[in-house]
C-alpha cells in the first residue's frame, strides 16, 4: 500500500559551510528517501537553513554586513555540496521567511491559549558596553572549581565542572571584555513540566507509528526515560525559556515588544515552513498534508547531539498547538577518523568540498557510508585504508567487474542480444527471495546489512561466471555448434541480468551510476524501481567504463589542510611577528634576575611611570622606572617578586637614573588589546636567583 512521507534533516546553521557531518546525515536520509520512492511511496523531502540567532547577528556585524546577507552567502553554497554528493531535496528553504514567521507565531499563540506559556522575571548577565544580554557562550571567567582562566559561562574545559554563569570568578564579556552586570528581564517559558506535557511525552516516547515502527530508537527512548523521570513519578522536566531580548536576529514574539523567539523554537518550525513553501510551488494542500488525523508520516533525521529538542520540546509543542506530531525520529552518531574525533590540527579533518575538488567520486563516499551505517545511534568511523579497500574490492572488483566481463562477450559475439537458455536460474531465484530482505533492510535503515547481502550475491555471480569459464567457449566460437553458442550467450546474459538486479538494489546508494546502467547499458527510459530487479534485460549496449578504482594517494590529498587555510597569513602571537632567531650565546648575554619590589611610588610629572625600589640580593637596592602606571596601583606591587634585566646599562632619565628593566607583557596593539602584565615568579624564588 502506497504511503505519503514528509521527511526532513536537521537544519544547518547558516553561519558556515556544510561540514562532513551534514553530508553524512543528508546521504543517510537521501538513501532512505530514494529507497521509499523506488517502493512506490510518495515522499516530500525538504530542508532549510537555520537562519536566526545571536551568532549569525554578531558574525554579520563583525563582517560589516546584514544578517540576511550572511545567510544568503552560505545559502548560495548549498547546491554545490548537495548536487556534488547526489543529495536530492525536493525543496530548500530558510527559517528567515514569511512562512516561518507565521507558523512560529501561530504555534506560540496556540500554546498560550492552552495555558502553557508563562512569563517570569529572570536575572542574567548583561554587557553594558554591547548593550545586550549574554548567552553562556559569550561569558568567560575563572572556573570556580579548578580556577582555570578563560572558561565559558556554563562549563570548564579543563576540569569538566558544570556551573551557572554567576558562579564564575571575575567574569567578563567575550564580546567586549567588559565586566557583565546582573540585570532582570521578563522571559517567556513553555511549561514542559505541565502534567499534560509529561503524560503526553511518556506515551509518545514509548509509542509507535502506523507501520508499527517505534517513534524512537531504543537508545533514544532510554535517554528520554531518564529525562522524563523515574518510576517514582518525580517530574524531572524543566520549563523551557523560549524568548530572547533585543538586540536579536529572529522572529518577534507577538504582543511583546523587544522580545524574540529563541532560535531553537523557530528552527524546527522551519521544517513545516519549508514544506509549506514547497506545497505552494507544487499546488499541494499543506494543511491537508499535515492533518493530525491524516495518513502522512512525518520523519526526521537528526544527530545525537540534538535529541533533547526533537524528542521532548518539538513533539510537545506540536501536540498542544493542535498539529501533527512526528511519526519517526531517526538519530545517528558522529563521524570519527580511524577511531578518533576529527581534528584539523592533527590532519584528520574531512572537508566535503575538498573531497569533490580533488576529483574523488561522490559515490565512493555514499557507498562507504552505506556499508557502515545502521539504525543504531553509533558513530561512523572513516578509515582511509578500509575506504580504499572496500570501494576497490566491492564496487570495482566485484560489482562493476561482472558487467565489464560479460558485456564484452555479448557485444563481440551476439551483437548485444541477450538470450536465456531454459527457464531455471538458481541464482536468480535465490536473489528474488533475498531482494525482499534487502528492501526491508533499506527501509529499516540497516544499510550495512543491505550492502552485505548485495555484495554476497555479487560474489555468487562472479563465482558462477568463473566456474562456467565462458572465455574457453569463446575461443572457438566461430566453429562452435549452436548449443555451445547458446550456452555462452546464456552464461553471459544471466551474469548481466544479475548485474542489473544488483544495480537496482544499489540504486538508493549509487543513484548516478544506477541511472547510467539503466539508461545507457540496458536502454531503459527511466531510472530503476524495485520491481525491475526481476525483469530480465533483452539487450545490452557496448560496455563503457563505469567507475575508477580509488588511488590511495587521493586520501593523502584529502587530509591535507584546505588551500585557504594553508595560504592564510601566519598567526601573530601577541599581535606581532616573532623576532629574528638568536643563538644560545646571544641569550646568555642577558642576565635575568629575581627581584623583590621593596617600594613603589608614582613619579611626579609622569602619566606613565612608576618608580620601583628593588632588592636583587646585592646588599643594596636598585632604582628602576617602569611604564606600568596605567595597570597597577603602587601599593599593590610592594612585596611582590618580579624579573629584572640586571645587566642593562643604567639609563639617565628626566626623573633620575634607571638601573635595569622590569619584564612585563602586553599586546602590540595596546588600544585594541589593552593590558600590561608584570611577570611574577612563583613563590619560593629568592631575590638574586638567575633566570636560565
From Swiss-Prot:
Binds 1 zinc ion per subunit. Its cofactor is Zn(2+). The gene is metG. ATP binds at residue 344. It is found in: Cytoplasm. Homodimer. One of its GO terms (cellular component) is cytosol. Keywords: Aminoacyl-tRNA synthetase, ATP-binding, Cytoplasm, Ligase, Metal-binding, Nucleotide-binding, Protein biosynthesis, RNA-binding, tRNA-binding, Zinc. One of its GO terms (biological process) is methionyl-tRNA aminoacylation. Pfam families: tRNA-synt_1g, tRNA_bind. A motif ('HIGH' region) lies at residues 12-22. Coiled coil: none annotated. A motif ('KMSKS' region) lies at residues 341-345. PROSITE patterns: AA_TRNA_LIGASE_I (PS00178), TRBD (PS50886). This is Methionine--tRNA ligase. It catalyses: tRNA(Met) + L-methionine + ATP = L-methionyl-tRNA(Met) + AMP + diphosphate. GO terms for molecular function: ATP binding; metal ion binding; methionine-tRNA ligase activity; tRNA binding.
Amino acid at each position: 500500500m502506497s504511503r505519503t512521507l514528509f521527511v526532513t534533516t536537521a537544519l544547518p546553521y547558516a553561519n558556515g559551510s556544510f561540514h562532513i557531518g551534514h553530508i553524512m546525515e543528508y546521504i543517510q536520509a537521501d538513501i532512505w528517501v530514494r529507497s521509499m520512492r523506488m517502493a512506490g511511496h510518495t515522499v516530500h523531502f525538504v530542508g532549510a537553513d537555520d537562519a536566526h540567532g545571536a551568532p549569525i547577528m554578531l558574525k554579520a556585524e563583525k563582517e560589516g554586513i546584514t544578517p540576511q546577507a550572511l545567510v544568503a552567502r552560505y545559502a548560495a553554497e548549498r547546491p554545490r555540496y548537495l548536487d556534488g554528493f547526489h543529495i536530492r531535496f525536493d525543496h530548500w528553504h530558510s527559517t528567515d521567511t514569511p512562512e516561518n514567521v507565521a507558523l512560529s507565531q501561530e504555534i506560540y499563540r496556540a500554546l498560550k491559549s492552552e495555558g502553557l506559556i508563562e512569563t517570569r522575571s529572570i536575572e542574567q548577565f548583561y554587557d553594558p558596553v554591547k548593550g545586550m544580554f549574554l548567552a553562556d557562550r559569550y561569558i568567560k571567567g575563572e572556573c570556580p572549581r579548578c580556577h582555570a582562566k578563560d572558561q565559558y559561562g556554563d562549563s570548564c574545559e579543563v576540569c569538566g565542572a558544570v556551573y551557572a554563569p554567576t558562579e564564575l570568578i571575575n567574569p567578563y564579556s567575550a564580546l567586549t571584555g567588559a565586566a557583565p552586570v546582573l540585570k532582570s528581564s521578563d522571559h517567556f517559558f513553555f511549561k514542559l513540566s505541565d502534567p499534560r506535557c509529561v503524560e503526553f511525552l511518556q506515551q509518545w516516547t514509548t509509542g509507535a507509528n502506523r507501520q508499527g515502527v517505534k517513534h524512537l530508537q531504543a537508545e533514544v527512548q532510554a535517554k528520554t526515560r531518564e529525562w522524563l523521570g523515574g518510576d517514582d513519578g518525580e517530574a524531572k522536566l524543566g520549563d523551557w525559556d523560549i524568548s530572547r531580548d533585543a538586540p536579536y536576529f529572529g522572529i518577534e514574539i507577538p504582543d511583546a515588544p523587544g522580545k524574540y523567539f529563541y532560535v531553537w523554537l523557530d528552527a524546527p518550525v522551519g521544517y513545516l515552513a519549508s514544506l509549506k513553501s514547497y506545497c505552494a510551488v507544487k499546488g499541494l494542500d499543506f494543511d491537508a498534508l499535515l492533518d493530525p488525523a491524516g495518513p502522512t508520516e512525518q520523519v526526521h533525521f537528526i544527530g545525537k547531539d540534538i535529541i533533547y529538542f526533537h524528542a521532548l520540546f518539538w513533539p510537545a509543542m506540536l501536540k498542544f498547538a493542535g498539529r501533527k506530531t512526528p511519526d519517526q525520529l531517526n538519530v545517528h552518531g558522529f563521524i570519527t577518523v580511524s577511531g578518533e574525533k576529527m581534528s584539523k590540527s592533527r590532519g584528520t579533518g574531512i572537508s566535503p568540498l575538498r573531497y569533490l575538488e580533488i576529483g574523488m567520486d561522490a559515490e565512493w563516499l555514499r557507498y562507504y557510508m552505506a556499508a557502515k551505517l545502521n539504525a543504531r545511534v553509533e558513530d561512523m568511523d572513516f578509515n582511509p585504508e578500509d575506504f580504499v579497500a572496500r570501494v576497490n574490492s566491492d564496487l570495482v572488483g566485484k560489482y562493476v567487474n561482472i558487467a565489464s566481463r560479460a558485456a564484452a562477450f555479448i557485444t563481440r559475439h551476439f551483437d548485444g542480444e541477450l538470450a536465456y537458455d531454459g527457464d531455471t536460474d538458481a541464482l536468480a531465484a535465490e536473489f528474488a527471495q533475498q531482494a525482499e530482505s534487502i528492501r526491508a533492510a533499506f527501509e529499516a535503515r540497516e544499510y550495512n546489512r543491505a550492502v552485505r547481502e548485495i555484495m554476497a550475491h555479487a560474489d555468487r555471480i562472479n563465482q558462477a561466471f568463473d566456474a562456467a569459464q565462458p572465455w574457453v567457449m569463446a575461443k572457438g566460437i566461430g566453429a562452435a555448434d549452436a548449443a555451445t553458442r547458446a550456452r555462452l550467450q546464456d552464461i553471459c546474459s544471466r551474469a548481466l541480468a544479475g548485474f542489473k538486479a544488483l544495480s537496482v538494489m544499489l540504486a538508493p546508494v549509487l543513484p548516478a551510476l544506477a541511472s547510467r546502467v539503466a539508461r545507457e547499458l540496458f536502454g531503459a527510459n527511466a531510472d530503476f524501481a524495485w520491481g525491475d530487479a526481476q525483469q530480465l534485460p533483452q539487450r545490452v549496449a557496448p560496455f563503457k567504463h563505469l567507475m575508477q578504482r580509488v588511488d590511495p594517494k587521493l586520501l593523502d590529498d584529502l587530509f591535507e589542510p584546505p588551500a585557504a587555510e594553508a595560504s592564510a597569513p601566519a598567526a601573530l602571537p601577541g599581535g606581532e611577528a616573532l623576532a629574528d632567531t638568536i643563538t644560545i650565546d646571544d641569550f646568555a648575554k642577558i642576565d635575568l634576575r629575581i627581584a623583590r619590589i621593596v617600594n613603589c611610588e608614582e613619579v611626579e610629572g609622569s602619566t606613565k611611570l612608576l618608580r620601583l625600589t628593588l632588592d636583587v640580593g646585592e646588599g643594596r637596592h636598585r632604582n628602576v622606572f617602569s611604564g606600568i602606571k596605567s595597570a597597577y596601583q603602587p601599593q599593590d606591587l610592594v612585596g611582590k617578586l618580579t624579573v629584572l634585566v640586571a645587566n642593562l646599562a643604567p639609563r639617565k632619565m628626566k626623573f633620575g637614573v634607571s638601573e635595569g628593566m622590569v619584564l612585563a607583557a602586553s599586546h602590540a596593539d595596546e588600544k585594541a588589546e589593552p593590558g600590561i602584565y608584570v611577570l611574577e615568579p612563583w613563590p619560593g624564588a629568592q631575590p638574586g636567583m638567575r633566570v636560565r
